[in-house]
A protein has these predicted regions:
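Internal, charge-rich low-complexity segments
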Residues: 3-260
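Compact beta-sheet-dominated globular domain cores
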Residues: 167, 248-292
Length: 292
């Protein structure tokens, strides 16, 4: 009887251990398959709108603050080198660099503002994109795996994989390559080149120091909000994919999903109007929502 009781107790312990293990496995599976998110689309949209507002206000302030200094550069080589850097980077499109250097901005700095908006929007796009390779080239391989998973797995599976992968990838990537300060310094560099291309006087180092001193905090705040989007979209949302977008010139303008920020709103659109042509540059971030 004692032997039978001991055997029954052993079997019970084994069964309890097995049950605990299976329960833990089910909890893990439930976590992996759960698609409930704490972040609403409205919150994400509000964040993107805040980023766009910061881009506009920062570009407008910088372009206005330097209005008295456009065309005062004493050395044409400095202007030419800045135009070359902008042209090579494609950060403000193919046409704007030369236009900036050959236009008188002293009366109206609107072209400077547009160029600054374009540069800041493009840099914010790279900072906000979860799979951007502009700073972390390691993510390119992970993104290719994710793209393949999206073709064959459920949203709950590849969405959870994305959140976990990006969370742990961020943990091992050096802070100096991914923090707001690094992105802000990149923004300062391109603001500097735009101003130099417009003929602002001073050496590249002097103008850059001015930009950093007077607008560094603004640009870091912009970079911080872009990284907030990156973290939320990449690491917190499972049930859908949210991505910021920019349109690369010279793509054709499509009014069904693009907005012409400088259009004449007083002039009614005609259904027989000719195509609007190609875009010059993108000045704001767009937002795409995908759910499979």
């Amino acid at each position: 009887l004692e032997r039978a009781l001991a055997q029954a107790q052993t079997e019970r312990r084994d069964l309890t251990t097995l049950l605990d293990r299976r329960t833990a496995e089910l909890k893990e599976a439930q976590t992996y398959l759960n698609k409930v998110d704490d972040v609403a689309d409205s919150e994400v949209l509000a964040l993107v709108q805040r980023i766009n507002t910061q881009i506009f206000q920062t570009a407008a302030k910088i372009s206005d603050d330097f209005q008295a200094f456009y065309g005062t550069q004493k050395y044409s080589a400095i202007v030419k080198e800045a135009v070359g850097r902008l042209d090579k980077s494609t950060m403000v499109g193919a046409e704007l660099p030369l236009i900036l250097s050959t236009t008188d901005h002293s009366a109206d700095p609107i072209l400077v503002q547009i160029a600054l908006q374009c540069a800041l929007a493009t840099l914010a796009f790279h900072a906000a994109s979860p799979w951007s390779t502009s700073f972390e080239k390691q993510t390119a391989f992970l993104h290719s795996i994710y793209a393949e998973m999206c073709k064959h797995e459920l949203q709950s599976v590849f969405g959870r994989w994305r959140t976990m992968t990006l969370t742990y990838a961020r943990a091992i990537i050096p802070e100096k390559t991914q923090g707001a300060s690094a992105h802000a310094l990149k923004m300062i560099d391109y603001v500097n080149d735009v101003l130099l291309a417009c003929g602002v006087d001073g050496s590249p180092e002097q103008v850059r120091d001015l930009v950093k001193q007077h607008y560094g905090k603004r640009l870091k705040q912009l970079a911080t909000h872009a990284l907030d989007f990156r973290r939320i979209a990449g690491e917190q949302i499972v049930s859908r994919d949210l991505q910021v977008i920019v349109v690369w010139p010279p793509s054709p303008f499509d009014p069904t999903w693009m907005e012409d920020e400088w259009a004449d709103t007083k002039k009614p659109a005609s259904p027989t109007a000719s195509p609007a042509g190609n875009i010059l540059c993108t000045t704001n971030l767009g937002l795409i929502r995908q759910e499979r």
